[in-house]
Amino acid sequence: MDVNPTLLFLKVPAQNAISTTFPYTGDPPYSHGTGTGYTMDTVNRTHQYSERGRWTKNTETGAPQLNPIDGPLPKDNEPSGYAQTDCVLEAMAFLEESHPGIFENSCIETMEVVQQTRVDKLTQGRQTYDWTLNRNQPAATALANTIEVFRSNGLIANESGRLIDFLKDVMESMDRDEIEVTTHFQRKRRVRDNVTKKMVTQRTIGKKKHKLDKRSYLIRALTLNTMTKDAERGKLKRRAIATPGMQIRGFVYFVETLARSICEKLEQSGLPVGGNEKKAKLANVVRKMMTNSQDTEISFTITGDNTKWNENQNPRMFLAMITYITKNQPEWFRNILSIAPIMFSNKMARLGKGYMFESKSMKLRTQIPAEMLANIDLKYFNDSTKKKIEKIRPLLIDGTASLSPGMMMGMFNMLSTVLGVSILNLGQKRYTKTTYWWDGLQSSDDFALIVNAPNYAGIQAGVDRFYRTCKLLGINMSKKKSYINKTGTFEFTSFFYRYGFVANFSMELPSFGVSGVNESADMSIGVTVIKNNMINNDLGPATAQMALQLFIKDYRYTYRCHRGDTQIQTRRSFEIKKLWDQTRSKAGLLVSDGGPNLYNIRNLHIPEVCLKWELMDEDYQGRLCNPLNPFVSHKEIESVNNAVMMPAHGPAKNMEYDAVATTHSWVPKRNRSILNTSQRGILEDEQMYQRCCNLFEKFFPSSSYRRPVGISSMVEAMVSRARIDARIDFESGRTKKEEFAEIMKTCSTIEDLRRQK
């Protein structure tokens, strides 16, 4: 029978059906080709919003820079970046007045973090612009390369392992007249193979040194590499995002630590919390406004949208904020926090790969690298690209564009939230000094504004005042995209509120299914996702049971592990049937070995191995979990693992799942083709780091591992630890005198070698 889909919604309030309108099923759109065009759009737009500012030239790099601060205020609704310094400082002062001691306390907390943070903090994060190779690399490799170059140039403060000392090296490197960099490259040559007598291509990896003068080095240190943001749903056009290099990252981290500490103390801030905690925080603000709007007042909520938040923010404003927030703090602390905004006001945007041309008639393809855009003849380009290039040309230096105004996406989320909250804070009656007042929520560029007033005219006046206050701080509320409703129904960061938050289940859809890590992890992640959605997202028992059955089916098709008694033929069915026939207790077989599924919605929290352990044949247990079995993963597996889930919007989330090491928790080997490329040297470096870290962990098992706060190298830490352990073992009689003497001797030898080095 055909079901009329509208029947599904008869009993559902419209807000709960919001899920069905979200573009979250199916594959998200990905970008192909180069991001050069999108980056040029960003650079040109940013300059357009600040065009009535003052032009200056950077004395070191010669880059032209536009400064819109304290510029003319816009006449009408056009977005603009002309923030007024005195207004920003006043907003900060009022924020401090209504939260006594907030800045002071956050500074004290941050100072502690600054002194204790290790440089390995910078290894977190995905792709990072590696200035030594002028392209993107994994964060850990980019950091390693930076430190290697610093050391070969005699910058050695970083050896203490503290982030703040690494940053001292960064500062000093900018004063150097030249920096010598080692790059990996590969040579190809044709040689005759002795055995087969055929000609083969031999690749050798070379390292070559070259010197960067001060100007080139500064340009690289201030460069943000750009890429296209992938997998953005619900948008027709792609957009560019930026990844900064290692010189900037450490400074940004400290600024964001301070801002995060402030946000934690602000009830209107949607950061840094997430999930249910965020919902509770937001519900509080709404409750406050509803209870305070007595019978005499009416209350309205704006679901807000800001026009081009990042492109109208300005690093110079952030510098003013930091100067105010840290006003009574020690000089060194103020300096270290002011460097990030200063670097950002001198930033350069790398234009990416350039343009690809192809001639249909001659079947030729050629790449025009970004470096050539400054002086190539424009007749080859279509009109829109021509306009872009003409506009950006005055800003180009060595394939990067000078981009002083604006912030790139996601760099100062916390600090910009503080700026937004400072405007919400001005809505208290003691500041508005009239009958209307406002409050709201802010999370990076997203906001919800709740206005209370005795009548409609008051609401309108309140909204207008909020709008104009925002303009003074370089924030542009979009009149087209923001909408107003009676308080009780609004949307904020994709949470829909209707007398309480309704579950937006569609956002979780992409996380369902088989993740593709390995058989063991996938089973665990799959059931954990279902469990989490029952807890957090109104996934009902019947739907959860169905989701579970679909997941098991999906899992069996993915790993070709249908039940041993099935008729389905796959490549694995021969082996699985054999195992099925020789197993006494068939219920004990894992699903991935052709066993039955014992999961139901009551036992989703138990790892499959534990669920079936008592039901397993003894020899099966032995094969499955025997540490001597070469197929059991030998990584000391933590009892809790992290999977990276890609929710429908927002950053990738870490999701914890239970992990039991079995023959099914294999880790796939690296693709061999990397070994023949110029990346090989980098790979060897990575393996060396891996070995060092593993060795270090042997000395400091996680149970006793305290971050060393003192200043010592890894080697020193391990040697001193070895001595302590040896002494304890010797005194308790666990080791003999000869062994003890030998350990001490080895420790001394290591120290001697280290000194000679």
Swiss-Prot record:
It is an enzyme of class 2 (transferase). Residues 53-82 are annotated as: Disordered. Its EC number is 2.7.7.48. Residues 249-256 are annotated as: Promoter-binding site. Pfam families: Flu_PB1. Keywords: Eukaryotic host gene expression shutoff by virus, Eukaryotic host transcription shutoff by virus, Host cytoplasm, Host gene expression shutoff by virus, Host nucleus, Host-virus interaction, Inhibition of host RNA polymerase II by virus, Nucleotide-binding, Nucleotidyltransferase, Phosphoprotein, RNA-directed RNA polymerase, Transferase, Viral RNA replication, Viral transcription. RNA-dependent RNA polymerase which is responsible for replication and transcription of virus RNA segments. The transcription of viral mRNAs occurs by a unique mechanism called cap-snatching. 5' methylated caps of cellular mRNAs are cleaved after 10-13 nucleotides by PA. In turn, these short capped RNAs are used as primers by PB1 for transcription of viral mRNAs. During virus replication, PB1 initiates RNA synthesis and copy vRNA into complementary RNA (cRNA) which in turn serves as a template for the production of more vRNAs. Belongs to the influenza viruses polymerase PB1 family. This is RNA-directed RNA polymerase catalytic subunit. It comes from Influenza A virus (strain A/New Zealand:South Canterbury/35/2000 H1N1).
